[in-house]
Regions:
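Glycan-recognition and catalytic cores of secretory/periplasmic carbohydrate-active enzymes
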Residues: 5, 10, 25-26, 49-53, ...
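Histidine/acidic-rich helix-loop-helix segments that form or flank divalent-metal centers
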Residues: 64-72
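Active-site activation/catalytic loop segments of kinase-like enzymes and analogous catalytic loops
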Residues: 28-63, 76-96, 108-116
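ATP/Mg2+ or Mg2+-diphosphate-binding catalytic cores
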Residues: 87-145
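Active-site acidic catalytic loop and adjacent metal/ATP-binding pocket
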Residues: 1-32, 42-46
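A short, ordered amphipathic alpha-helix with a cationic face
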Residues: 22-24, 79, 98-102
Length: 145
């Protein structure tokens, strides 16, 4: 749940992970989604695709020939994760006064929109466009309760 670039450290040319107390078993692509669509780090689409393909060639759990399905799973997980992050960041602002998380909201919306390029998300797109119109997604007005 908390796997992202800030929790990966390099020591003596070896990768290590910190802050792993919330680790749980789940979909194999959840951590990949967390890395390629990290709301705090902007990466280009080539990097995202390369990382997914690299992961698929290194793991024995998912075959590279299942790339299309893996890419769809990655989109589902990324959208779910980033919608949750939107809620968490707004809650941290409203409840705790932590304004610094608000700067990540526009990029989080961009990541969600990027991943909704599959027809399976058509209804979700309509719902989000109704609930939070695109013109309002970069505004920082959270005064309504």
């Amino acid at each position: 749940r908390d796997f992202h670039a800030d929790n990966i450290m390099v020591k003596n040319k070896t990768l290590g992970i910190i802050d792993s107390q919330d680790a749980i078993k789940g979909n194999l692509l959840y951590d990949v989604a967390s890395l390629v669509d990290d709301v705090r780090i902007k990466t280009n689409n080539n990097f995202k695709t390369s990382l997914l393909k690299y992961y698929l060639t290194k793991t024995k759990k998912i075959k590279e020939k299942e790339y299309v399905m893996a890419k769809q799973d990655l989109s589902i997980l990324s959208i779910q994760r980033n919608l949750k992050i939107l809620g968490i960041f707004v809650r941290l602002y409203k409840r705790d006064g932590k304004i610094n998380y608000l700067k990540f909201l526009p990029h989080t919306w961009k990541l969600i929109e990027l991943r909704m390029n599959n027809e399976i998300f058509n209804n979700l797109k309509k719902l989000l466009d109704y609930a939070v119109p695109k013109k309002n997604r970069n505004k920082m007005n959270f005064n309504a309760n």
